């Protein structure tokens, strides 16, 4: 009897910790679905960032999204279309500016990204601080699972679908450009096009992830699973698969930890 009671107690605890949050609350189900979609799309993008030695560029673009999201917030509050559009425009503007500066100066692209992302982060924090509360600033920076509703989930699903299809179409030239960009440009001269499309995918995934993860932490679900998978495998297909699995596990564990401990979801994930 004592063993049965102990087993029953453990079963109840496991249910309360692992299943009840998703069974009882819509926002947790939305957040879980959002993390699943992000893992399927952002993790493969992160693999290409690692392969192309652009890990810090992903971080820089994550910071660059903030001022655009802040402007969207000042115009429309926490309206999803306003904040998402502002973040996407800001991310693309910074990516293009960094590329132009590196082309017309002696500075390399990663150095330009470092300068631009520090500036954009400072501007974004100032804008949100001027126009909102500390709660709004924490939401934009570190995410909130309470903010993941059906429209946010629809945005994430759309971005994930677009990313997966686009990566499937441009996989070969993107992989070749990651390994030998000079050869690709000599063969078809479209290396810059694939690079631009890839940057668009990076910014799209960062914008899609900001509701649950925040602008500062969205890049984490993109980079950390890819970096961890790189320690275990070298094959590109296995690298993508393992990074997606790591992202799914971290996303699930982070959501549960965020819910039970009552902390922002972005850092927890």
What do these predicted regions represent?
Residues 28-39, 80-93, 157-158, 207-221, ...:
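Structural signature of hydrophobic alpha-helical transmembrane segments
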Residues 2-40:
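Membrane-interfacial amphipathic/re-entrant helices at transmembrane-helix boundaries
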Residues 17-26, 43-52, 72-82, 173-185, ...:
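Short juxtamembrane and helix-loop transition motifs at transmembrane-helix boundaries
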Residues 14-21, 28, 112-172:
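Transmembrane helix-bundle core of multi-pass membrane transporters
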Residues 153-222:
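Helix-loop-helix "hairpin" substructures at the membrane interface of multi-pass membrane proteins
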Residues 216-267:
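Transmembrane alpha-helical segments in multi-pass inner-membrane proteins
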Residues 36, 40, 44, 89-97, ...:
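Generic alpha-helical transmembrane segments of integral inner-membrane proteins
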Residues 47-62, 66-133, 229-241, 258-261:
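Short loop segments and helix-boundary regions at transmembrane helix junctions
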């Amino acid at each position: 009897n004592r063993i049965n009671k102990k087993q029953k107690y453990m079963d109840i605890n496991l249910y309360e910790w692992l299943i009840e949050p998703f069974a009882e609350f819509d926002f947790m189900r939305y957040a879980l679905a959002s993390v699943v979609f992000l893992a399927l799309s952002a993790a493969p993008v992160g693999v290409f960032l690692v392969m192309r030695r652009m890990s810090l560029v992903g971080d820089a673009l994550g910071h660059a999204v903030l001022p655009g999201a802040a402007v969207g917030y000042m115009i429309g509050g926490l309206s999803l279309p306003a904040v998402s559009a502002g973040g996407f425009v800001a991310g693309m503007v910074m990516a293009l500016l960094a590329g132009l500066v590196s082309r017309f100066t002696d500075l390399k692209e990663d150095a330009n990204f470092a300068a631009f992302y520090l500036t954009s982060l400072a501007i974004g924090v100032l804008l949100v601080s001027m126009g909102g509360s500390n709660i709004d600033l924490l939401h934009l920076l570190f995410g909130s699972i309470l903010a993941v509703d059906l429209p946010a989930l629809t945005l994430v699903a759309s971005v994930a679908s677009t990313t997966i299809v686009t990566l499937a179409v441009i996989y070969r030239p993107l992989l070749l450009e990651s390994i030998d960009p000079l050869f690709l440009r000599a063969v078809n001269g479209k290396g810059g096009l694939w690079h631009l499309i890839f940057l668009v995918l990076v910014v799209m995934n960062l914008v899609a992830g900001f509701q649950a993860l925040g602008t500062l932490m969205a890049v984490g679900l993109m980079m950390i699973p890819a970096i961890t998978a790189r320690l275990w495998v070298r094959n590109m297909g296995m690298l993508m698969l393992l990074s997606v699995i790591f992202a799914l596990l971290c996303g699930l564990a982070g959501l549960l930890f965020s819910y039970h401990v009552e902390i922002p979801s972005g850092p927890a994930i």
